[in-house]
UniProtKB/Swiss-Prot annotation:
InterPro entries: 3-IsopropMal_deHydase_ssu, Aconitase/3IPM_dehydase_swvl, AconitaseA/IPMdHydase_ssu_swvl, IPMI_Swivel, LeuD. This is 3-isopropylmalate dehydratase small subunit. Gene3D superfamilies: Aconitase, domain 4. The gene is leuD. Keywords: Amino-acid biosynthesis, Branched-chain amino acid biosynthesis, Leucine biosynthesis, Lyase.
């Protein structure tokens, strides 16, 4: 998992509350277990005018030239609600997003973001509204998200602070997913197995 330290990136606006996981990545695209290749289907029903995904909807915000290459998604309350699917953060990450800023998230989606190297920032509704105004009026506006300092710096230079669980912060900052955390305990696991082979050798008989 790629470490998350400081992110300087274009912020794309998705001015909709209660965006559910079926809108983030529709169910017909959940047929594989690899984590890549989902970005093209992100927000499929909004991004495209046809089922095949060949005709872009010019009215949808992410299709606007000003948001090309965006790595931060600025959105509204209760993002990621609906059915549980880890494909939702996979699709966002595969598209290019590394962080989301919103007033609130659905719990399962919120947890899945951390497990997949994405930082879901929670700011107050009025702070999100300020960022919406400053970004919408500034083409190519970039935000800076500093995980160590737990700050978001807007286009005007105003700094917002956010909270993040210390363990999740440690994992993101060091690029550690569940497998990475386990591998860090490799020497202890090896010592345990060695001891176990001595006292319970029958467990290792093939």
């Amino acid at each position: 998992m790629k470490p998350f330290t400081v992110l300087n990136g274009i912020a794309a606006l998705l001015d909709r509350p209660n965006v559910d996981t079926d809108q983030i990545i529709p169910k017909q695209f959940l047929r594989k277990i690899e984590r890549t290749g989902f970005g093209v289907h992100l927000f499929h029903d909004w991004r495209y005018l046809d089922d095949a995904g060949t005709k872009l909807n010019p009215e949808f915000s992410l299709n606007q030239e000003r948001y090309k290459g965006a790595s931060i998604l600025l959105t509204r309350d209760n993002f990621g609600c609906g059915s549980s699917r880890e494909h939702a953060p996979w699709a966002l990450e595969d598209y290019g997003f590394r962080s989301i800023i919103a007033p609130s998230y659905a719990d399962i989606f919120f947890n899945n973001c951390f497990k997949n190297g994405m930082l879901p920032v929670v700011l107050k509704s009025e702070e999100v509204e300020e960022l919406f105004r400053s970004v919408s009026g500034n083409v190519g506006a970039k935000l800076q998200i500093d995980l160590d300092k737990q700050t978001v710096t807007g286009p005007t230079g105003k700094v917002y602070t956010f909270e993040v669980d210390s363990f999740r912060k440690y994992c993101l900052y060091n690029g550690l997913d569940d497998i990475g955390l386990t591998l860090k305990q490799g020497s202890k696991i090896g010592a345990f197995e060695k001891k176990q082979k001595e006292v319970e050798p029958w467990l290792y008989v093939i």
